[in-house]
Curated annotation (Swiss-Prot):
InterPro entries, A to Z: DUF4640
Domain of life assignment: Eukaryota
Stretch list, region Disordered: 167-186, 224-244
Pfam families the UniProt entry points to: DUF4640 (PF15480)
Coiled coil: none
UniProt name for this protein: Uncharacterized protein C12orf71 homolog
Annotated disulfide bonds: none
Comp. bias (Polar residues): 224-236
Length: 300
């Protein structure tokens, strides 16, 4: 079954190539003797079956450059590693080139299909589709982001400035009580030079008085000294008076202690009458009564 299928595929590919040759000779005047092309030289019979799956993508070739493009196609087949997407791209480019004309055939045929970056570098129009719209969106996003950042920075700058102004105002404006104190201090400082100036004037005027004192002034000074001595002697107590006061205070303390002792003992006696101690006075009275009872009475 596999051998029959491969042989049938091989015959089909040969028929396709013969039809392409006939179309070339009929349309452009191409003669096979000038540019011979043998499919056996390029593709072996075993590999023809793999090419059949993608052979229907190939457009009808027109012009003398068709054989060269087919040769390049089969040479690139091994490099594409049986990738159907790459093969479809190649067939689409060939069909587009046939529709447009053969002027750009060589440029498209020389493209490297494996390197997608080279394709995009040579034809940037396919890569730059819809880029203005994307760029506009990106620019808008960047503008909004920058606006937000500027707003945040402006707020952050405004807040510290306001706080700094408030701090400066608070530092510059002292509380009312400190302001009053500073005002009084300022007034006192202003009064100090005046007071010093008056003292200096008095000192300067003092030598103008006569150096000798009057007799009346001397008498007044001596009287004042005597009165001060009397008051000091009256205020300072004498030693006799001090000893008398000490004795009276000691006697007062003794009387207070005696009174407290009697009060305590009397209270204890009232609370415990059976255990109350007998005083010496009571003992003496009892003895006297006992002596009287023991006397010998005369007989009648």
């Amino acid at each position: 079954m596999t051998t029959s299928a491969s042989s049938s595929d091989y015959s089909n590919t040969e028929d396709c190539i013969s039809e392409c040759k006939s179309n070339q000779s009929a349309s452009v005047g191409y003669y096979p003797s000038e540019n011979t092309f043998s499919y056996e030289d390029v593709v072996s019979p075993e590999e023809a079956a793999s090419v059949e799956s993608s052979a229907h993508f190939l457009p009808p070739v027109q012009g003398s450059w068709g054989t060269e493009s087919l040769r390049r196609l089969f040479r690139k087949r091994d490099q594409m590693k049986h990738d159907p997407e790459q093969f479809c791209k190649l067939s689409i480019t060939l069909a587009w080139d046939i529709d447009v004309g053969s002027d750009r055939a060589d440029s498209l045929a020389n493209l490297d299909l494996n390197s997608h970056s080279q394709w995009m570098n040579k034809w940037p129009e396919d890569r730059t589709k819809l880029t203005p719209y994307k760029l506009d969106n990106l620019v808008r996003k960047l503008e909004t982001f920058l606006g937000k950042e500027k707003g945040g920075q402006h707020d952050s700058h405004v807040l510290p400035e306001s706080t700094q102004k408030e701090d400066v105002f608070l530092n510059s404006s002292p509380p009312p009580h400190t302001a009053q104190v500073s005002h009084h201090e300022h007034d006192a400082c202003q009064d100090l030079p005046k007071h010093k100036a008056l003292e200096n004037e008095d000192i300067c005027q003092a030598p103008e008085n006569p150096p000798r004192l009057l007799k009346d002034e001397v008498v007044e000074i001596s009287q004042a000294d005597g009165s001060s001595l009397e008051t000091s002697s009256m205020s300072s107590p004498r030693p006799e008076d001090a000893s008398h006061l000490h004795r009276t205070s000691c006697m007062n303390f003794q009387w207070v202690f005696h009174w407290l002792r009697t009060q305590v003992s009397s209270r204890w006696r009232r609370e415990h009458p059976s255990q109350a101690p007998v005083s010496w006075h009571q003992k003496a009275m009892r003895r006297m009564h006992s002596f009287r009872g023991n006397r010998i009475q005369p007989q009648e």
